[in-house]
Amino acid sequence: MSCITTNNVKRLIILIIFVVIIWQFYYYASSKHNNNFLNEKIAIVPHDIKCLFNQPNCSEADVDGWSLVQAFIYFVVGLIIPNKYLIIIIVSIILEILKPFIGYEPKYIIGPLLNTTGYIVGSMLSPCKNNYKEKYQIFE
């Protein structure tokens, strides 16, 4: 039995839309007061790692609240649609490449690493994992 059903995909799309709407409302409201706690640095990444490609403003590419929110979204995706690692890595890299075009600062190394880590953890904890013991009868 596979857990990738039409209902799960619909729920995932609704969840992502809901999170993006809340994200935008919060960002708009907090930008007026300049106290957006999600912009606070949580972990400082070594300069050689975050500036691997020498992109502009790479020195600000540390782990912040927004990075963890994205990792949490990927965690939820991993719970609902597990074991699609290559697709998740490609999507994560493409989104980081597109960020400068929509006005966000990209984190070319840290973003995909955190997103993939969130997805892997969600995928490992997913109740939708294939049961290879029953499917292939190789373990007894």
Curated annotation (Swiss-Prot):
It is found in: Membrane. The chain crosses the membrane at residues 12-32, 75-95. It is a multi-pass membrane protein. Glycans are attached at N57, N115. One of its GO terms (cellular component) is membrane. It comes from the Viruses. Keywords: Glycoprotein, Membrane, Transmembrane, Transmembrane helix. This is Uncharacterized protein R495.
